[in-house]
């Protein structure tokens, strides 16, 4: 999927100016080779910091990621310099090929703690199992009979041309998407000129991502946290809705709205409010 995302960035650069030289560089990561050993680092997916090292060392000039994988701590020397228009942010249910319903006796798979938490509320009593690896490897395990179903990102499947595998879309109220889900982010080295990314960058996406990532950073989130938030813009106003979890595992929901120019502050304020509510519960 990373290659497909990078190729979309390359096409956008070529449309801006065909004379800008662009080369695709693929970098093998520990997540590609040993997905079961890959661990988050500061709230980032493991492949992110490996690509960031290549960027910092000058091996590459741009790095392309799913924004949801880099939603916690950020390196100011390697800023996000462009964010794509948002693809479908919803989570979806995928069943084994040729199967029309969840099969009894097999777990339902997912790849993040916030999905696992929300699925436990939607399907009480069902066995849930975390599944590492990329989209295709997870689908292989699903089709080989290891799982009754797999909950995945609609955006990831659509990027790979696998929309036909989707059996059910969860609304953003049923399953609040992960922070940054559906966005592709481009990283560069601080201070470098990246005007050639003007066609790729989406202003509304930038503001929404600021709100969601501010929420995640304030709560110390990432794939290892059950908390998440989803923001949207309507008529110059931004709304961000999310939740955290108290020590007893109960959901604490909240929603803030305000002018788009306050995007980052809205994310921080929602997170702070939810954290205060959780602290009051003890």
Language-model regions, residue ranges each:
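Small-molecule-sensing regulatory modules
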Residues: 1-42, 116, 121-282
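Helix N-cap/beta->alpha junction signal
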Residues: 2, 48, 112-113
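Beta->alpha turn/N-cap motifs
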Residues: 28, 47-48, 65-70, 152-157
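Short active-site-adjacent helix-start/loop capping segments
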Residues: 31-35, 63, 71-74
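Short, structured active-site "lid" loops
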Residues: 36-62
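A conserved helix-loop-strand patch within extracytoplasmic ligand-binding domains
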Residues: 67-68, 74-125
């Amino acid at each position: 999927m990373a290659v497909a995302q990078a190729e979309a960035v390359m096409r956008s650069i070529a449309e801006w100016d065909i004379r800008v030289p662009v080369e695709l560089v693929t970098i093998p990561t520990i997540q590609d080779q040993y997905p079961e050993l890959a661990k988050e680092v500061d709230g980032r997916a493991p492949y992110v910091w490996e690509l960031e090292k290549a960027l910092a060392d000058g091996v590459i000039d741009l790095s392309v990621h799913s924004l949801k994988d880099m939603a916690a701590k950020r390196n100011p020397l390697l800023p996000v310099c462009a964010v794509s228009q948002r693809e479908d942010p919803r989570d979806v249910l995928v069943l084994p090929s040729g199967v029309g319903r969840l099969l009894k006796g097999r777990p339902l798979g997912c790849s993040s703690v916030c999905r696992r938490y929300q699925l436990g509320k939607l399907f009480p009593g069902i066995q849930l199992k975390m599944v590492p690896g990329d989209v295709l490897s997870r689908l292989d395990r699903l089709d080989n009979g290891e799982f009754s179903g797999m909950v995945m990102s609609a955006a990831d499947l659509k990027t790979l041309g696998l929309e036909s595998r989707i059996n059910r879309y969860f609304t953003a109220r049923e399953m609040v998407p992960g922070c940054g889900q559906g966005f592709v982010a481009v990283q560069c080295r601080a201070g470098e000129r990246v005007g050639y990314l003007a066609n790729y960058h989406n202003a509304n996406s930038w503001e929404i991502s600021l709100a969601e990532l501010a929420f995640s950073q304030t709560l110390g989130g990432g794939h290892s946290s059950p908390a998440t938030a989803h923001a949207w813009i309507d008529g110059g106003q931004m709304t961000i809705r999310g939740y955290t979890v108290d020590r007893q595992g109960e959901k604490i929901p909240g929603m803030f709205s305000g002018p788009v120019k306050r995007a980052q502050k809205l994310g921080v304020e929602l997170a702070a409010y939810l954290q205060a509510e959780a602290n009051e519960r003890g």
